[in-house]
Amino acid sequence: MKITKKPSKVQQFYDQLARAAFADPFSFLGPYIPAEQGALRVWMPGADNVALVVEGQARVALEREGEGGFVLKDGRNLRFTHYQLAVDWAGTEQLLDDPYQYHGLYAEYEDLHTPKQMYHHMGAQFVTLERDGKMVSGVRFLVYAPHAAACSLIGAFNHWDGRRHPMQRLDYGIWGIFIPGLPEGTQYKFELKGPHGEGLPHKADPWGFYAEQYPSFASVTYDHRRYQWQDTAWQQRPVTEKRKQALSFYELHVGSWKRGENGEFLNYRELADQLVPYLVEMGYTHVELMPVAEHPFYGSWGYQPVGLFAPTSRYGSPDDFKYFVDLCHQAGIGVVLDWVPAHFPSDSHGLANFDGTPLFHDPDPRRGWHQDWNSYIYDLGREHVRRFLVANALYWFEMFHIDGIRVDAVASMLYLDYSRSHDQWIPNVDGGRENYDAIATFKWMNEEVYKHFPNAMTIAEESTAFPGVSAPTFMGGLGFGFKWNMGWMHDSLSYIKEDPVHRKYHHNTLTFPLIYAFSENYVLSLSHDEVVYGKRSLMYKMPGDEWQQTANLRAYLGYMYGQPGKKLNFMGTELGQTAEWDHDGQLQWFLTQFERHAGIQRLVRDLNHLYQAQTALHQLDCDPRGFEWRLQDNADLSVIAHERMDEAGNRVLVITNFTPVPQQEFRLGVPKTGKYRLLLNTDAKQYNGSDYPVLQDVSTEAISSEGLDQSLLLSVPPLATLFYQWSAK
């Protein structure tokens, strides 16, 4: 019987290295090997020869030790704490720093588990070390893959060869390696082996700051320290209560606002140079960007992100995106990002089955798979997933100076039965449908954001009546600063679509949102969701002929700006777009050559400036003290009126006529004696309205109306909204 000799431990380790399956390279490579094995071991598969290079000393050739291995048996005559390797690749010499001489360059527990610190340590970080009086710069890589049997760093620098740079298994499920001399802009990925040694698809860095597009989807090294910010004045502005500020958001998709001459994307810098002056002119206070975190599928609009820490490279580098934010801030414009913590796509290079296990999602599809979106749901019951997401939110505030996040699809996270039949979901521990893990995550995230960035704001896109979304966590709420008022959007659009003849039968639809208008801190949103998938453009939602459609839209926008709540318009609303939004094109800028559309653009501009200038229109947006009905239930005329107030007692009267019938002598009761001065009329000539005669100034009369002793006799144009400012004299 033939006896097979068992390979030595050294040979076993070489076999593992050759299969990119070695988890403990620092025990076998570099200068820290057992003394009986030699002074230094190098792993350089494909090299012909390797020599040790120490400054001030003669080169020492290393002995070959198996295929790809080289060893220095006796180093007693050498003194060094830093060395290089002269590697002969088929006659071509390359001088390299050996990564395996840099031992213990990692991070403490708190740095790896505190969200505010994690993005300064995880992923690819540029660091500089001192060795023998010399500074050695390079990139330290840390990745969390607790169930992987092995992990290698691969990239253009090692010809994507997983054998070349095995990473060290560290504590807490983290793998690490430091690569000296690696420049910025280097492509890299991770090559992992699953729990049973099985090969996995090459993975992009979950913490990567920069990424390439199709087909490689590789992560790219990026140094956050380089960009020189110019927004100090903005960053140092006093902390203010956002609920009392005028907040007018311009929702924008970067790839389709405008295109270049040949239909190409504008990059972040080109976009900033054109967009910022436009936002200032139009009176918007903030731009809200649809998701810019790296996403492989452009048609997802960013709502299927893979690289949560990287602004998409479709439009430029992270520095270019910083320039965009910087320029906005220098012009007094805040930047809000759509943030997607609800789900992630199944792309093989992403988070899906990252280490060969469902590391970021629940393996049970009843909790881990979103059947509507064909994507995985983050498992918020796991601490590392919660930390990852909270760290990501903080990262955008700190590293890119953003001012807010709008959290997408909050309802889908709060309810375990969201969009599921009775047999497709698992109840919580109490038998209910609330997702306790999501609730806890939102509370933690909001507390962290407001603790570290007091001037920030968080906004929830939440479509249900879940209580306390924008209430502080110490009062039992989720802690968001604001919530989109989806009910107002749905009801008001449902009403305005009706023919004016029929609107009197739907009057309650218009007035009902005021019953709950102050139950949350609301943003009135006319978002991208309302102008896609056959829903038609806002203009073409309006009934009637061309004149009535345009007048309806003007009246509706005026009504919106008079209502309590912050304002959000999707790009193109101000143009009166006739087409639905198309992410493969650009807005219909040519429409502004027609007065019908130019008038709407001027109206939105003036509404924004009016909203900012009149504290009565914004200071108490989230406080019932700032709103009083003047005419609520005149369904037959389809006219509504209310007053908005500020803390100082200033008042603005808002009247909307939702029919094409003018009201020539319209008496309206008001509570105070004085004079009302016209501020804005959506039917005015400059907005391409009918310019129906209205009073510029009107004084109260001691004639009772609507239960009030004082009243005004007004002229109200057809399909129009009027704003009047009250004064005591």
UniProtKB/Swiss-Prot annotation:
Keywords: Carbohydrate metabolism, Glycogen biosynthesis, Glycogen metabolism, Glycosyltransferase, Transferase. One of its GO terms (biological process) is glycogen biosynthetic process. SUPFAM superfamilies: (Trans)glycosidases, E set domains, Glycosyl hydrolase domain. InterPro entries: A-amylase/branching_C (IPR006048), Branching_enzy (IPR037439), GlgB (IPR006407), GlgB_N (IPR054169), GlgB_N_E_set_prok (IPR044143), Glyco_hydro_13_cat_dom (IPR006047), Glyco_hydro_13_N (IPR004193), Glyco_hydro_b (IPR013780). Pathway: Glycan biosynthesis; glycogen biosynthesis. Its EC number is 2.4.1.18. It is an enzyme of class 2 (transferase). It catalyses: Transfers a segment of a (1->4)-alpha-D-glucan chain to a primary hydroxy group in a similar glucan chain. The active site is at 408 (nucleophile), 461 (proton donor). GO terms for molecular function: 1,4-alpha-glucan branching enzyme activity; cation binding; hydrolase activity, hydrolyzing O-glycosyl compounds. GO terms for cellular component: cytoplasm; cytosol. Monomer. Belongs to the glycosyl hydrolase 13 family. GlgB subfamily. Catalyzes the formation of the alpha-1,6-glucosidic linkages in glycogen by scission of a 1,4-alpha-linked oligosaccharide from growing alpha-1,4-glucan chains and the subsequent attachment of the oligosaccharide to the alpha-1,6 position. This is 1,4-alpha-glucan branching enzyme GlgB. The lineage of its organism: Bacteria, Pseudomonadati, Pseudomonadota, Gammaproteobacteria, Vibrionales.
